[in-house]
Regions:
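Iron-sulfur-cluster electron-transfer modules
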Residues: 11-15, 19-22, 45-49, 57, ...
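Cofactor-cradling patches in redox/metallo enzymes
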Residues: 158, 242-332, 376-387, 391-398, ...
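Intrinsically disordered, low-structural-confidence terminal and linker regions
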Residues: 1-40
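Iron-sulfur (Fe-S) cluster-binding segments and ferredoxin-like electron-carrier domains
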Residues: 84-112, 153-172, 380-386, 423-437, ...
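C-terminal amphipathic alpha-helical segment
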Residues: 342, 348-397
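Extracytoplasmic substrate-binding proteins
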Residues: 173, 294, 324-332, 346-362
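Short hydrophobic beta-strand segments
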Residues: 232-242, 365-376, 457
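Short cysteine clusters
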Residues: 76-82, 86, 145-151, 155, ...
Length: 497
């Protein structure tokens, strides 16, 4: 691994609130989207001349459109409950990575232009003009938030910094200041159908290769169908599952589950992506346009059910937004959840005894589980409260003998972010990603030391990609991370009657 241009934080035995380092991350900004990327999404190609007036007008539009945003602007009492809850503050010490300080970047503009006191007595209420210097701060620090929502769990008023960040990014896009990584990915989905830009013929070839590899492993014809009309299930999964390790191991696991259960399924070349970066940039229209591919594919293929693969923010969009974005789903079989997570699907089969496992097949692994933010704090799973926590763990303990959770304050709804979500999984933000992973790495280190953990399962493509990149910075092997259905794939018994 190449030498990093920054210092990796030291792992500590006990969590420590860092000393404040003013401006520690002020230098870090993601690449700005070039004109062609902006134009393709309908945004101004470069920063518009009257950007200040348009930004203020856009803020006014969002304040009227999303009542919660105005509540968040008004409700904060600066109690400090959130200040040490952000993984980026814990990893960098930059006070502007405290959730309250990140909110205040917008709040001081809100007060200046949308409150009586701010208009006439700005200094008394901390209101400031929207200058280019302030805009640059916005671009830096609103692109240092992974929208994980951990801070909102601890806020006594439930202020959601993720929503504030989304609003700020939407404002910046509207005046021609977009983030390259996220906007480039959204453009690929519109042009090709997935985040990685894998065209249909390449996808078909990849799936054929996986079928051959799986037959070599199992001796059985486990299918990876594409664009099959009349299949019962349409699987919408992150495109990383088609492309790289460890993601592809979970795709193989999905296929084995469908095979063992005897349920017909298909992937779609039109909707070959579960991820939806429209949510990360806070743009409802982009989110809807990406999601509409799923509806069109489901109608075209005539499926009865839609199942979503292992992707955290994709599941949040599906669970929390699809109904209003692309519903109603009256053309699907209403006996099943709409949509349904692949873990719900597999767990249901396990509970009914429809699939069986050899748990000993995973005995070389001592497993822990990383709760992904958008699953933990942006959705549910199954019919019971907390199902998003119970179901993945129940699958793991059904397919493996050795499982240990990490420390209680680092899991479930208090889980720490992987450090790469929210549109930040780009190498121009690598320093932030590595430092932001510190709290999770410390919890993992404790589990390794106390229980001999050697495998961290997760159900998010971004988490898998992020951990694969940052684990070596903290002395761990990148192969330590993988999907829940990677474990399922290893243990499932195929061909049993």
């Amino acid at each position: 691994m190449a030498t990093a241009a920054f210092e990796t934080p030291k792992l500590r035995r006990y969590p420590v609130i860092p000393l404040v380092q003013v401006g520690a991350m002020s230098h870090l900004k993601p690449f700005v989207a070039a004109a062609p990327l902006q134009k393709a999404l309908g945004f101004p190609e470069t920063l518009v001349e009257d950007w200040q007036a348009k930004a203020i007008a856009k803020m006014g539009e969002l304040l009227g459109k999303y009542r919660s945003l105005q509540v968040y602007m008004d409700a904060c009492v600066h109690c400090g409950a959130c200040s040490d809850k952000c993984h980026y503050f814990l990893g960098t010490g930059d006070p502007k990575n405290m959730p309250v300080a990140r909110q205040d970047l917008m709040r001081k503009i809100y007060r200046r232009y949308f409150t009586f006191a701010g208009k006439y007595f700005p200094r008394l209420v901390g209101a400031v003009d929207l200058t280019r210097e302030v805009l640059d701060e916005w671009y830096s620090y609103f692109n240092q938030c992974s929208e994980c929502r951990r801070c909102s769990v601890f806020c006594p008023y439930g202020i959601d910094t993720a929503e504030v960040t989304m609003a700020a990014r939407e404002i910046m896009d509207s005046i021609g200041l977009g983030q390259k990584y996220s906007n480039e990915i959204i453009g690929k989905v519109h042009r090709i159908g997935n985040n990685l830009g894998i065209p249909g013929p390449a996808l078909e070839n990849t799936l054929e290769g996986l079928a051959e590899d799986t037959k070599d492993e199992t001796g059985l014809d486990v299918r990876f169908p594409l664009d099959v009309k009349g299949a019962e299930v349409l699987l919408i999964t992150p495109s990383a599952d088609f492309f790289s390790e460890p993601h592809v191991e979970s795709l193989i696991g999905y296929a084995k589950v469908f095979h063992a259960a005897g349920i017909s399924w298909t992937l779609s070349s039109l909707a070959s992506e579960a991820g939806n970066f429209g949510m990360f940039i806070g743009n409802y229209d982009q989110m809807q346009r990406i999601s509409m591919r799923v509806r069109e594919a489901a109608l075209e293929l005539g499926v009865k059910r839609i199942v979503v693969g292992e992707c955290g923010h994709a599941w949040r969009v599906a669970y929390s937004f699809w109904n209003t974005l692309i519903g109603p789903f009256d053309f699907l079989d209403q006996r099943y959840p709409v949509p349904q997570h692949i873990c719900e699907f597999t767990d249901d089969l396990i509970q009914r005894g429809a699939i069986r496992f050899d748990k000993d097949a995973n005995d070389q692994r001592v497993i822990t589980f990383h709760d992904s933010c958008n699953v933990a704090r942006g959705s549910r799973m199954g019919s019971m409260p907390g199902g998003q926590f119970i179901i993945p763990r129940r699958i793991i303990t059904s397919v493996a003998n050795h499982f240990h959770d990490m420390a209680p304050h680092t899991i479930l709804e208090s889980t720490f972010c992987c450090g790469g979500g929210g549109g930040l999984l780009t190498d121009d933000l690598l320093e932030l990603r590595v430092k932001g992973a510190l709290p999770r790495m410390e919890a993992l280190k404790d589990a390794v030391d106390e229980h001999g953990v050697n495998f961290m399962a997760t159900i998010c493509a971004i988490c898998k990609a992020q951990f694969t990149k940052v684990l070596p910075y903290y002395g761990f092997d990148m192969s330590m991370v993988g999907g829940v259905h990677q474990l399922v794939s290893k243990a499932i018994r195929l061909g049993d009657k």
